[in-house]
Structure formats: structure tokens, C-alpha cells
Amino acid sequence: MKLLIWGLSGTMGNLISVAAQKDSHWSNIAGVDAKNPTSNLKHTPEVIIDFSHPSALEGVLDYAMAHGVPLVIGTTGFEKEHLEAIDQAAKHIPVLQATNMSLGMNILFSLVEQVAGMLKNKADIEVIESHHNRKMDAPSGSAVTIVECIEKGLGEARKHQHGREGQCPREKGEIGVHAIRGGNIVGFHEANFINELETVKVSHEAHDRSVFAQGALEAAKFVVNQPTGLYHMKDVLGLT
């Protein structure tokens, strides 16, 4: 199968390329980045994996729709208008969008929703994420997804408190979200459900970025066999 990696020169783009070269499923692997535009491509891909930058989204969506190519989006840091554009594209081609491609992280998404649904208003909720010092967006896309899953379990949206300083007593019902940046941390996420008597922690730590590359390739194998629509990693992993 012919694979196009959008954002080949980036860390994840390189990892996906290396992983794909070891998998006989992929007969042709090409890449697009600032130095290698789509005009240089020799073949029309059968699936695209995008790990680039929010500013590149319009280009990848236009190309995928123009050629009718299924698309996997692993880029994070999107604004509301980006997500709306992805929703529109999914009306024309199969699109799989995920803030995290690992099996373990997607299990965590499912678990925090369940815990939130069980505890409801019986706990203060704090989400902590840690990444390497080169990560551009904060909070991480995965932390945003964790909060979304928690709110789904609660059955309501909550105020989000990003960090704390000065005189700021905790408001009842708010969800605290905290980002740590340092060194070469691959990715750590933890949801804390805290009350006066006990704390429930649900956490995940990635040891190697290749886990995201493998997940992206599995997502690509999945999305090529799907009809037009918007999909997520829980669909790939059967967690729906």
C-alpha cells in the first residue's frame, strides 16, 4: 500500500517512516514537508498520515479531498476552526483524528470517563501532563482529550483552571489542568480524583515515541477500509 507522511522531517514523521519501512504492508513510502512539496510526488498515495503543524492542516485536507485519499491526523494544537475544517473534510473522505495513538493512552481515556461517571461530584479533579522541553502546545492534546472524557463521564462541562498562582482558592467543580515541560520526557498523563478520604489516580507513561508511530500505522490500515466519516483511535482498538 502507498503511504504518504505529511510532516516527514519532524520527529514523528521520521519515526513513522522507519516503522513503515520495517512493515511489508507498505509498498511505497513518500513524504511531504517544507522542502518536499506535493508537486514532487511520483505516486498518488492510498492513505496519508499527518504529523505536521496546525498551520499545514488546510494543505493536507485540500490534497486529501482532491485525490479522495483517506487521512490519519495525529497533529495536535488545533483551534476551533481547525476542528471544524476536519469535520467538514470527514463528509468527503474517511478521516481518523486522534490526540494520542497509543493503545494504553486510549484505554486511559476510557477509564477516566468511567471513573468520572462513578464519582460525579464526590471528588476534586486535577489533570497533570508532562512532556519534553521542545513540545510547542500546552496543555497537550491528550490532556485536552482526558478533560473531554471526564466531562462526558460527568455529563456536563466544567470550568477549566490552567495552573494556579497567587491567592486563588479552588472553586467547587472546576477541573485543574497542569503542564510540565522538561528534558526528554516522552509523555506522562495523570488524572486525579481527590476527596477528603482518598485519591483515585489513573495514569499512563510512554517510554518510547515509537509507540505512537506504530499506532499511527495501525490507524492508517484501519481508515483505508472505512466509509466516509470521522473516526478515532477507540474505533481502531474496539473501545467504542
Swiss-Prot record:
Any one annotated GO CC term: cytosol
Residue numbers binding NADP(+): 35
Keyword presence, Cytoplasm: yes
Catalysed reactions listed for this entry: (S)-2,3,4,5-tetrahydrodipicolinate + NAD(+) + H2O = (2S,4S)-4-hydroxy-2,3,4,5-tetrahydrodipicolinate + NADH + H(+); (S)-2,3,4,5-tetrahydrodipicolinate + NADP(+) + H2O = (2S,4S)-4-hydroxy-2,3,4,5-tetrahydrodipicolinate + NADPH + H(+)
PANTHER family associated with the record: 4-HYDROXY-TETRAHYDRODIPICOLINATE REDUCTASE, DIHYDRODIPICOLINATE REDUCTASE
HAMAP family cross-referenced by the UniProt entry: DapB
Full protein name: 4-hydroxy-tetrahydrodipicolinate reductase
Source organism (scientific name): Alkaliphilus metalliredigens (strain QYMF)
UniProt lineage: Bacteria, Bacillati, Bacillota, Clostridia, Peptostreptococcales
